[in-house]
């Protein structure tokens, strides 16, 4: 081979090698940083898809007494319309667990539990099996009692805190009812989320008969907030106010508006961090039924739930 041909051949080989090296260094199209990694790696055939669940907390005023004369027909139709997957109830007066289950069956819930069958009990109804973990009654100083249950892999705590301004049996001065509620909430927290800190999914709801610092923008100066501050320090988030800057009242309704009570929020759904990040909607339900059949408005949330217990 002639000398100039050899030189030309070597030059072409060097140029081709440079092109090959450049091609190796260039990113592939599939590695475009604008495309999220999960879109590249997720297998639609095996990925876990969440279900959407709805939960309502409702104080039904002494066993839904305003609809008892109609055999609870209006209440049943309302629940069917809202279609919660499970529902916490305060003031299930005069219900037994058997009769509450029968009522729940009418609106599509096959399961129900009641904390007791006297006084002002709390209850829980569900489309899905309820694992009752504890009835909080005489073993802790709770005025109305509480329920700790599990639905799917979600811990659900239903409570109704002490309703009066002074200690039971007239003990103590005005305002000491706050101290009793503080005692109740600490007993409930000690028996539930503090006792099982490694369990990530918690909802705690009910009539707290007390005020949250989250509502300080709508409350008078000097309002007592410690009951809810204790809850917030225990790993719970306010499902309503942590998603909305606006104040919403849960009392009074039209039923008792003439009493002259100022708008207040005493009905809450609290969520642990693992639950809070999956909530897609939270609201107080204002409609014709809720305005006229109880002295409290119900609270509702919707959330994503991963069957694997994500």
List the predicted regions and their residue ranges.
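Active-site beta-strand/loop signature of hydrolases that rely on acidic residues for catalysis
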Residues: 53-60, 78-97, 156, 181-218, ...
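Structured beta-strand-rich core segments of catalytic domains in phosphoester-bond hydrolases
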Residues: 86-166
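Active site of divalent-metal-dependent phosphoester/diester hydrolases
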Residues: 110-124, 210-278, 285-291
